[in-house]
Amino acid sequence: MKLLSSYKNLESALNDLFFTPTGFLYNEERVLFNSSVRALNNYEMVLSAMAGGANKTGDIANKVGLDKANVSSILQNLCMMGIVEEVYSIAPKLKKIGWHISDGYFAFYFRFIYPYRNLIERNQGTIVLNHTYENLNTFIGRRIEPDFIDYVLGNTLFAPERYGFSEFPNPINKQNEEIDLVAIDREGRYLFGECKWRNQKVGEDVLTSLARKASLLSSSVYGLYVCSKSGFTDEALEMAKHNNKFHLINGDKLLES
């Protein structure tokens, strides 16, 4: 934050720090790694694959062309360094579903900088910065989910025994469903939550979808919590007004907490 405070806006800060060859944070990744790992290129390929959406050891191995044992060893080392962590789905039962980049700097670097280094090295960082801005809400939405969970659980009387992200099969369409927050208390009641970080208002379709997905896991619903960066449509507000299970949260509440 101290680095950002000296700039007039976020765009100029990102451009100067990341999107120029001499940017303070442009080469920081290699500075941090060079004293810690061998075969740096393999580590970078693994993190790039993860930033691109691969989150299972086998998928990462296939994407980067390394064997699973090598990738598994790299992931374990990155985990010990605090850069990645295992991801678990907590409902309907606890299970490991993959890995994700937990460190914010590395997540940003390998999502927006690493794949476009050639452009940045040719002083075309503005092109990359524009691409970054187009996708920044999606990135921030994922990074802010822990704050959403903390806010919801810190502002209810619900006392969960376990909580977190959930991925589970839909027995009707045979596809996987995802919910940002599922919390379960000792009495077997469920609390569900979704966080939408985008420039458009959240509509009733998001509320309906959350209620539908929740019904696949439990009929004992304590509450349905939806957070939106940009507020809610009149239809969504009206829907929540007539269903006391819904609790709507404006995104600025997360930034204040």
Give the residues covered by each predicted segment.
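Accessory nucleic acid-recognition modules appended to NTPase machines
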Residues: L3-N176
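Domain-level recognition of nuclease-like catalytic cores that cleave nucleotide substrates
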Residues: Y225-S257
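Well-ordered alpha-helical segments embedded in enzymatic catalytic cores
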Residues: M45, D205-R212
